[in-house]
Each structure stands twice: as C-alpha cells, then as structure tokens.
C-alpha cells in the first residue's frame, strides 16, 4: 500500500477518512466495516482528487492477519478506485486511536483542508467529536454515514459511555498536541 509523504498528501484538496467497524473471528471484515468501505468508495467517485485514508487495525479480540484498513482498501480498489490514492493507518483499535494515529501519521504535518469522515450512522456523533477534539477547529470535518449494519442497534447502546470515555481521555490535552495524545494512548489505552 502506498505510504505517501505529507508533501504528497498535501496536494490532495480533500481527504476522506474511513473508519473500520470490526473484524469477524475468522479474519473477515464485519458487516459494518464492509458498509463503511462501500460508502467510502461511493464518496470517492464524486471526489476524484481526494486522498483516502483507511483507518483501523481491529477491535476487540485477537489481531487478524489483515487489518480493517487493508481489508477496506481492497474493497475500495475492487470498486474501481486507484490503489495509489489510498493510505493505511493500521494501528488503531478504537475511535480515539483512529483519530490520534491518522493525525499523527498523516494530518499533523499538512495544512487543514476539508475532510469527510465515513462511518456507521450510530457512530457519527462520537467519531466527529473525537476527530474535532484531536485536530482542532481549523479542520472542516463532515460526517458521511454508511448504510447501517445488522448489529448497529446493539452497538449504539454503548455510544453514550464511549463518548464520556473519549472526553475524559482527551481532557486537558489541547487539539493538535498529538505527541501527548500518542503517549497517553500508548501508556493507557481507553479500553
């Protein structure tokens, strides 16, 4: 997969970030991951100059052979999108990790620009707030909902608790203080 330098990434007028939604025990993408990748592929067709960042290692459980990010990238390429446009962030295991690692690896070194954040409908509020807390107000972030997955209703029940955990984790850290966020994430993951 292409690991563009920030200088190459900065040429893209817009960025699409798609968040993984889990992997099944056999190592295949969960329905939420597939739906999110489909939505990202659809969005990419109408934003021909945007760079795409697929974010996610895996959620709970053992690490599969292929990350959520790599699996989503493969699906997006199968939908006709050039692989050279796709970047991977494959360390994160949750939404805070998505925001911190995407920012640390790719976004911190480039000027702010419009960004589309693709995730499940139930996950939009928390993911948008998390990325805004990490990146700060200079970044114009728009949420894009994928089609719902069969387990979205069950997963949505946990969102208020996860949002409180996110706010607590990032409390006292200013947007853009990525090194502090990375250090805190490595020291005490929010899970």
Residue ranges and their predicted role:
Residues 150-191:
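C-terminal capping/extension of enzyme domains
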Residues 1-159:
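A structural signal for short, hydrophobic/glycine-enriched beta-strand patches
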């Amino acid at each position: 997969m292409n690991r563009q330098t920030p200088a190459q990434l900065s040429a893209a007028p817009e960025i699409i970030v798609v968040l993984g939604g889990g992997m099944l025990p056999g190592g295949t993408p969960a329905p939420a991951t597939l739906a999110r990748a489909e939505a990202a592929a659809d969005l990419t067709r109408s934003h021909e100059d945007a760079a795409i960042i697929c974010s996610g290692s895996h959620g709970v459980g053992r690490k599969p052979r292929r990350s959520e990010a790599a699996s989503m990238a493969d699906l997006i390429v199968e939908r006709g999108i050039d692989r050279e446009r796709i970047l991977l962030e494959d360390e994160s295991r949750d939404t805070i990790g998505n925001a911190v690692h995407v920012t640390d690896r790719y976004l911190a070194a480039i000027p702010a620009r419009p960004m589309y954040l693709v995730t499940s409908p139930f996950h939009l509020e928390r993911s948008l707030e998390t990325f805004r807390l990490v990146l700060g107000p200079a970044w114009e972030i728009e949420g894009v909902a994928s089609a719902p997955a069969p387990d979205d209703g069950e997963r949505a029940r946990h969102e208020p608790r996860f949002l409180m955990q996110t706010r607590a984790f990032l409390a006292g850290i200013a947007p853009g203080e990525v090194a502090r966020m990375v250090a805190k994430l490595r020291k005490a993951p929010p899970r």
